[in-house]
Amino acid sequence: ENETRVNLPGEVPLSIFTSDMWDEYTARCIGCGRCNYVCPTCTCYTMQDVYYTDNGKVGERRRVNASCMVDGYTNVAGGGEYRKKHGDRMRFKTMHKIYDFRKRFGYNMCVGCGRCDTVCPEYISFSNIINKVTAKVEEVQNEN
């Protein structure tokens, strides 16, 4: 059971996306992806071509679990990469779980189980990240 109570925000203003709060995770996160692999709601995947040794002209394309937190996940042709910094990846993952998913389906993706908190070798608490976002949302709302 997760000892940290997760307070999910209601509406998330777009200013949270550019907040400097994400810089902390550029320094702390090592991009191992453990948080994604234990998360019951993470669904990132990549495609992998497997060729059979019997006949190199025959094979299959497999869907393989992946992690938006690891190096190489956002690589594109021509040597580009969308999210090089770990803080940018953390922002993407967080906002996907509490903003994008909610906007599409009407509820948050994070269930607050705390598995990600338990496995992080850098002791980054995703539960606390969500609570920080909630506090930042309240701060922005109070300014307006």
What are the language-model segments listed below?
Residues 1-5:
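Internal, non-catalytic "lid/hinge" segments that mediate substrate recognition, gating
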Residues 6-27, 45-144:
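Ferredoxin-type iron-sulfur electron-transfer modules in oxidoreductases and energy-metabolism complexes
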Residues 27-47:
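Basic (Lys/Arg-enriched) interaction patch that binds polyanionic ligands
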